[in-house]
């Protein structure tokens, strides 16, 4: 579990790189987040949810859970990016809710995207 939650706003969690693989944070070639992994960047009382980025220049496989929720009294949901520049396997969940505000944003950003109906990957 990684927890960057705060009373007045969520923090930032970067795994494998920064937003869209840009900036000075070194990028991973491959990133794997297991099904028992949980990442929180919630505003606990007030404020906006934080930012969580899961990135890889080649392949990202994400099976965990992310929350970047807005505060219980005020605030909007945060921003979550789960991206593999070439390939993305997304089998996890992201909760960007906000009881008193607007939902946050989820960015899934591989080079190509295929959406398949079903109950699982494989």
Please provide the spans of the model-predicted regions.
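Extracellular and secretory-pathway beta-repeat/beta-biased strand scaffolds
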Residues: 1-122
